[in-house]
């Protein structure tokens, strides 16, 4: 990320997003006074119980938003995004591998260890579902720290996890 920008957002809360956090995030983004040229890509599974509700929501937003389902190019979507807002699950490591500055949302108890580690490393900003009203202030901070956060995020992983696991299994 030589020249980090602030125009392409990626939102991914897991395939099912059973608590409709995606829609909550979109509502908070509406209140962030984002530039009109901002583009938001939302990755959701087709089995998400809220996908139609999110489709309706994006029609009323002051910025462009699009839902993508059954994606086979997640790494490409991440590489083409300037920031991500996502659950603090396994995708966190993928965002770090690509040096993608992020706001991570802890949506399950088992994600707190990852969220704490990534936050302390300076690789992402963290909020819980109960703190979504702080998204606007986190976006302001992220915008100011985007280049540094991209660097720290990329430092979290060396991108060769599969090779390391295979060596361990031998």
Regions found by a protein language model. Give the residues of each.
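Nucleotide-activated sugar donor-binding and catalytic core shared by glycosyltransferases
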Residues: 1-170
């Amino acid at each position: 990320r030589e020249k980090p920008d602030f125009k392409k957002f990626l939102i991914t809360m897991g395939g099912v997003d059973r608590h409709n956090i995606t829609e909550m995030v979109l509502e908070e983004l509406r209140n962030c006074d984002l530039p009109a040229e901002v583009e938001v890509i939302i990755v959701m599974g087709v089995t998400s119980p809220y996908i139609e509700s999110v489709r309706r929501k994006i029609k009323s937003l002051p910025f462009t938003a699009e839902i993508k389902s059954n994606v086979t190019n997640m790494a490409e979507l991440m590489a083409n995004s300037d920031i991500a807002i996502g659950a603090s699950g396994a995708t966190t490591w993928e965002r770090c591998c690509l040096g993608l500055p992020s706001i991570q949302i802890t949506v399950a108890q088992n994600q707190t260890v990852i969220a704490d580690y990534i936050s302390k490393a300076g690789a992402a900003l963290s909020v819980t579902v109960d703190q979504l009203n702080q998204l606007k202030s986190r976006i302001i901070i992220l915008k100011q720290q985007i280049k540094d956060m991209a660097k720290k995020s990329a430092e979290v992983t060396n991108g060769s996890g599969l090779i390391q696991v295979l060596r361990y299994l031998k």
